[in-house]
Amino acid sequence: LRYGLKEFLSAIHAGRVVIGISGGIDSAVNAALYRSVLPAENLLLVNTPTRFNSETTKNLARRLAENLEAPFVELPIDSFINETVSQIDDLQIPSPSDMKTLHLTGFMKENIQARDRSTRILATLSSAFGGIFTCNANKTELTVGYGTLYGDLSGALAATADLWKHQIYALGRTLNRYFDKNMIPDEIFTVRPSAELSENQDITKGLGDPLIYEYHDFLFRSFIEPWNRITPEEILTWYSENCLEEKLGTPVSIKSIFKTHHDFITDLEKW
């Protein structure tokens, strides 16, 4: 990864990089990874909180930047989100036959946050800073499209896009050993993964992403990586034969995740 980063940045003549950091593991690992190939002054780390972001993750973002000794700015975006919502929600679109009114759902409003961060803040900052901005996505989320088009899926390079979530954690610990220092604070490894886009993703209440990475990493891997890709029907058969953990290689018990057969099947049908 370090070699690839060096070669890519050299090929596109990009010596400066802007990284949006949330206080979560994906952006922290990306920040540390880029720091391993670039001087600290060539990085700009940016935290863009809304009212849904906890003090925990905001503080972790600051600590990460301090540890990496990289320039850091915090740019709250609530007022801009509210302005976008006020412009679009209930907007009337005239047509020859009638008047159509647009409505923004809660899900749409969540995506506005991700798009504001990337297309307004990070893109503009990278231009002013004289560099590129990163996509911090991982393979688990990309496999099922858990991301926002024109939002957190944007960026010049997605360096960790071929790493499953458990590999992101492993890379984070490897980078800490590389630096011989906990550049990535220990708490980032333990805080619940969450996009923090709504009250339903409030980590202070134990809420977060809908993905159970200890299981879904291995489920999704079986769908896309083997030459003889596994089907949902085979997954269901293995589950009924009580050999799913062995077949997938999950580090956790399936029964500890899904209390009933219905829960398991509902989750399988979701993806």
Where are these regions (language model features)?
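ATP/NTP-dependent adenylation/nucleotidyl-transfer catalytic domains that generate, transfer
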Residues: 1-22, 27-271
